[in-house]
């Protein structure tokens, strides 16, 4: 067999062994995809003993391409929620998550200077301690830029030493915080439900009878809250036992019953303007009115504003809600449509079919992947990652690299949604498949490269010392931020657990946090809020650390 054939065969063997190891669980917690790294170390130990030669060029290409696939699909997945997570509702969570990253970076600097740990080793320990594989790839990229290519294998070995406690340390910090503050889980779950009901602007609906005489004879569009900004949507109007879909120019009369959809706080306010809330059923449809869900799949309407489509003006169809990437929104006339948007519409049966023909609603398209945008995005990401940014005082220009470039481009493209007929929506199943393939390829190569001397380093070298450093980098930032967030910010414990798991981008830790109170979504919500920003910071931080520490050598 050729060296290339042997290399690919061994990579497949590593993937099989590693994924099998990753399925092992102790009390519901396992290595997950990280098992591939240890599968590579095991295989590398024996290939080193038997003197098998692997093709270096093939290994290098597979490692880099796997990393690109992984970070690009991560960006496409989290892109729609990335910028939303930076808004006011997520500022506190993202602030604490960024503080964890900052404290971990400071711990790296302290250990590097006081213990005189080599740059490649401390970056590998850092990546393993925070259980973030793209961080490892970014670190190896910047070391190559600094001319330290020969040290990238030892970086992978250090990563493997620190990785196991990186997972266990998150779980331990959750348990200790719970013990220290004597937290009662049921009380925390009740408090979260109470707080989310008051603070989170969820969508709701109410039925209101118009009793304000000042509104009699006004057009619907002239009433505050129903203008073009449309903070609240009126989907049905009942007058004299007849239910209709109101238009913008519909004249409102005293005694009309209106079915309103919007954010709960806004519904409370507009109820005070209109009249009184009534318990009269308007949700059930009579006559030829019906409600439907339409998925936007027609490339011709992507990027267009709802006003430009004229659905409401031409057909009398009201779009009451818009679900985008799992987030429910109140659509306005200026809302631009994206591929995969789910619209809740109300109208007469015959005109709803015309709305479907305009918007698409082709369910099969949701399962198809446009490959052209995928490779456009990857190509743009690689180009962006190769652009040098010259920063005064730095000895070498800073680059986003193959880890940062595709991630940034994917975040932007996912936020844009579409350009012309090109759309960057990717079905969740396809995204997950590409992401898993990418990370398996990357970790398999890292394991093969670093596994030859792993056992010797652990038994006879500095392996145990590296583990101690990793424990410090994992544990100290989590405990400091956890205590501060609970003690001073009064953060809900379930949300705090999601924050700690998200700050390490660690799915096993999220599974553990969810299991604390399975029926509560607090942990998953805070995890999803901080995940996009943390992933970006975890990729950028090792590059900044490498350049900073390299200049201080």
Curated annotation (Swiss-Prot):
TM stretches of this protein:
4-24, 28-48, 65-85, 91-111, 157-177, 371-391, 403-425, 439-459, 464-484, 496-516, 533-553
Statement: the UniProt record of this protein carries the keyword Cell wall biogenesis/degradation: no
**Location in the cell:** Cell membrane
The main location class comes to: membrane
Single GO BP term:
potassium ion transport
One GO cellular component term of this record is: plasma membrane
Question: Using the chain's own numbering, where are the disulfide bonds?
Answer: none
User: InterPro entries under this entry?
Assistant: AAE_transporter, RCK_C, RCK_C_sf, Transpt_YidE_put, YidE_YbjL
Q: Which Pfam families match?
A: Asp-Al_Ex (PF06826), TrkA_C (PF02080)
Q: GO MF terms on file? A: monoatomic cation transmembrane transporter activity
Organism's domain of life? Answer: Bacteria
NCBIfam families registered for this protein in UniProt: PRK03818.1 (NF003007), YidE_YbjL_dupl (TIGR01625)
Return the similarity comment: Belongs to the AAE transporter (TC 2.A.81) family. YidE subfamily.
Give the protein's recorded name.
Putative transport protein PM1071
**Native source species:** Pasteurella multocida (strain Pm70)
Lineage of origin: Bacteria, Pseudomonadati, Pseudomonadota, Gammaproteobacteria, Pasteurellales
């Amino acid at each position: 067999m050729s060296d290339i054939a042997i290399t690919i065969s061994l990579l497949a063997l590593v993937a099989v062994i590693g994924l099998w190891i990753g399925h092992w669980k102790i009390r519901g917690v396992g290595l997950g995809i990280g098992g591939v790294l240890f599968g590579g170390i095991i295989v590398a130990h024996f290939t080193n003993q038997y003197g098998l030669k692997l093709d270096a060029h093939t290994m290098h290409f597979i490692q880099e391409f796997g990393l690109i696939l992984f970070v690009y699909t991560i960006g496409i997945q989290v892109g729609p929620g990335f910028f939303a997570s930076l808004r006011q509702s997520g500022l506190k969570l993202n602030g604490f998550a960024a503080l964890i990253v900052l404290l971990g970076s400071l711990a790296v600097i302290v250990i590097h200077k006081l213990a005189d740990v080599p740059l490649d080793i401390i970056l590998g320990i850092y990546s393993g301690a925070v259980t973030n594989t793209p961080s490892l790839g970014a670190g190896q990229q910047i070391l190559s830029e600094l001319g330290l290519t020969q040290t990238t294998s030892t970086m992978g070995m250090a990563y493997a030493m620190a990785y196991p406690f990186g997972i266990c340390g998150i779980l331990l910090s959750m348990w200790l915080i719970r013990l220290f503050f004597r937290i009662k889980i049921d009380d925390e779950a009740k408090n979260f439900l109470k707080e989310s009901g008051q603070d989170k602007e969820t969508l709701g609906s109410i039925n209101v009878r118009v009793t304000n005489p000042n509104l009699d004879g006004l057009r619907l569009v002239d009433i505050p809250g129903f203008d073009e900004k449309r903070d609240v949507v009126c989907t049905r109007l009942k007058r004299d036992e007849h239910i209709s879909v109101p238009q913008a120019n519909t004249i409102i009369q005293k005694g009309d019953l209106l079915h309103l959809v919007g954010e709960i706080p806004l519904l409370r306010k507009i109820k005070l303007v209109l009249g009184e809330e009534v318990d009269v059923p308007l949700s059930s449809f009579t006559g030829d009115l019906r409600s439907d869900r339409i998925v936007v799949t027609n490339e011709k309407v992507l990027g267009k504003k709802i006003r430009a489509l004229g659905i409401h003006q031409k057909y009398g169809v009201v779009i009451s809600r818009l679900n985008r990437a799992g987030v429910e929104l109140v659509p306005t006339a200026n809302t631009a449509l994206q591929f995969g948007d789910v619209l809740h519409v109300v109208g007469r049966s015959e005109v709803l079919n015309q709305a479907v023909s305009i918007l698409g609603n082709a369910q099969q398209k949701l399962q198809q992947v446009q490959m052209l945008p995928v490779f456009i995005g990857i190509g743009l990401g690689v180009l962006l990652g190769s652009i040098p940014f010259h920063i005064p005082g730095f000895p070498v220009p800073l680059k986003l690299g193959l880890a940062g470039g595709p991630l940034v481009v994917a975040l932007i493209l996912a936020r844009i949604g579409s350009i012309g007929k090109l759309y960057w929506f990717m079905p969740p199943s396809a995204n997950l498949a590409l992401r898993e393939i990418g990370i398996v390829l990357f970790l398999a190569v890292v394991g093969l490269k670093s596994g030859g001397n792993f056992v010797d380093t652990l038994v006879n070298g500095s392996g145990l010392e590296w583990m101690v450093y990793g424990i410090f980098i994992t544990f100290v930032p989590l405990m400091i931020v956890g205590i501060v967030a609970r003690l001073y910010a009064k953060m809900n414990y379930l949300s705090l657990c999601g924050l700690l798991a998200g700050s390490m981008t660690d799915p096993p830790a999220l599974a553990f946090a969810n299991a604390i109170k399975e029926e509560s979504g607090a942990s998953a919500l805070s995890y999803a809020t901080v995940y996009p920003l943390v992933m970006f910071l975890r990729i950028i931080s090792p590059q900044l650390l490498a350049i900073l520490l390299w200049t201080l050598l």
